[in-house]
Amino acid sequence: MKRLISGIQPTNNLTLGNYLGAIKNFVDLQDDYEVFLFVADLHSLTPNIFDNTDFSTTKRQIIATYLAAGIDPKKTCLFYQSDILSIPLLAHILLCSTSIGELTRMTQFKDKSIKATKMANNTEMIPSGLLTYPTLMAADILTFNADVVPVGQDQKQHLELTRTLADRFNKRYGNTFKLPQVYIPKIGAKIMDLLDPNIKMSKSSKNLKGVIFLNDSKDIIFKKIKGALTDNLNKVKYDLTLQPGVSNLMTIYACLTNLSFKEIELKYQQQNYGVFKNDLANIVADFLEKLQQKISYWLNSPELDIMIDNSCERANDIAYQNVQLVLKHMQLK
């Protein structure tokens, strides 16, 4: 069975985009892959504005959300990134074989560097962790020698660098790493902001009215969906070019009902946007209410911490063996 790995940062609240773009897919994939899911707490340090307020609680809630969504701890290994000390060790090894040019070419680094603030000495405050983020991500993947990595389009370039680094290591020190393949779901891989369908729905959005959080109440969900940007065509049709707002709402609808875009179009061909939005709001609200109840169960269950400890032990054993092999091939061991 091939191995799949992915992580999510424990910052603020998870969104419906996080669920539909990642968590839901993990649930579907765990029957076909050996799945490793981690809370990427080390990546949370990247912006250099780390807020540790209730951080341990937030991390725990991420695991509870995975379980509530249907992740089976017997099939999937759930752990905290910071508990696996082999990861930062491998990250340093990979960093030493990565050029500055490779890191500065990363699109995310370029985009976020533009927003950097000027300091008193006229230099820009660009955290070094932002530059080295891709090598830590590569270590996350290669520490477990994963075959498959589900990533959004915004992370695809980082995975390509991971493959490059793995191949470079193999050629220099001998066959050690697999070259991980990208997995991008056809539907729901990227849920967009309700108010601006040109940007991804994000928990760090400046306007939270365009973001549905997993802990939103029914009233808030209805307000956000009713206020979602559409167009003046008043026709429920999937067209990313002419109707990006409606297409985004249809993607959410399709992911939660398993209906195709064509089936949704036929269902609402005689209906206006008001009816469509009301139905979608009910679907989202009903789904999140059930999910919230399951999350609450896990947060209050002593089984949660026992499960995390057991999964962490398993992850550490695998990571240690893999990185020890790396050290051996480099003759550092």
Swiss-Prot record:
The cellular component terms of Gene Ontology attached to this UniProt record, alphabetical and capped at eight, are: cytosol
Q: Say which enzyme class the record assigns.
A: ligase
**Sites where the protein binds L-tryptophan:** D140
Q: Which UniProt keywords apply?
A: Aminoacyl-tRNA synthetase, ATP-binding, Cytoplasm, Ligase, Nucleotide-binding, Protein biosynthesis
Q: Which Pfam families match?
A: tRNA-synt_1b
Q: Which cellular compartments is it found in?
A: Cytoplasm
- State the Gene Ontology BP annotations: tryptophanyl-tRNA aminoacylation
Q: Which InterPro entries match?
A: aa-tRNA-synth_I_CS, aa-tRNA-synth_Ic, Rossmann-like_a/b/a_fold, Trp-tRNA-ligase, Trp-tRNA-ligase_bac-type, Trp-tRNA_synthetase
Per UniProt, the short sequence motif 'KMSKS' region occupies residue numbers 200-204
Q: What is its EC number?
A: 6.1.1.2
State the similarity comment: Belongs to the class-I aminoacyl-tRNA synthetase family.
Its annotated function is as follows: Catalyzes the attachment of tryptophan to tRNA(Trp).
> HAMAP family, from UniProt?
Trp_tRNA_synth_B
**What is this protein's name?**
Tryptophan--tRNA ligase
Q: Which organism is it from?
A: Ureaplasma parvum serovar 3 (strain ATCC 700970)
The UniProt gene name for this protein comes to: trpS
